UniProtKB/Swiss-Prot annotation:
This is Probable Fe(2+)-trafficking protein. It holds the Pfam family Iron_traffic. Keywords: Iron. It comes from the Bacteria. HAMAP family: Fe_traffic_YggX. Could be a mediator in iron transactions between iron acquisition and iron-requiring processes, such as synthesis and/or repair of Fe-S clusters in biosynthetic enzymes. One of its GO terms (biological process) is cellular response to oxidative stress. Belongs to the Fe(2+)-trafficking protein family. SUPFAM superfamilies: YggX-like. InterPro entries: Fe_traffick_prot_YggX (IPR007457), Fe_traffick_prot_YggX_sf (IPR036766). GO terms for cellular component: cytosol.
């Protein structure tokens, strides 16, 4: 049976992650309050940020930037948007 949580991002009950997606306290916090769907949405956003900003994931500053963006996306005012990105129209 799937582990259900109240997703901090989606604001509803949803299937929780199978394991903490990141090490440390942030990973634990994500595991406890982020759904699989919200995590997949973040991975798409993260990929756009990496590509648009040409982040080198071997650079500790790039990794630190993404950790901050992850926390902002789920628990803050929202992560940075890729420049030039236009969300699809709802309808």
């Amino acid at each position: 049976m799937a582990r259900m949580i109240h997703c901090a991002k989606l604001g509803k009950e949803a299937e929780g992650l199978d394991f903490p997606p990141l090490p440390g306290e942030l990973g634990k916090r994500l595991y406890e309050s982020v759904s699989k769907q919200a995590w997949q949405d973040w991975l798409k956003q993260q990929t756009m940020l990496i590509n648009e900003n040409r982040l080198n994931m071997a650079d500790p500053r790039a990794r630190q930037y993404l950790m901050k963006q992850t926390e902002k996306y789920f628990f803050g005012e929202g992560a940075d948007q890729a420049s030039g990105y236009v969300p699809p129209a709802q309808g």
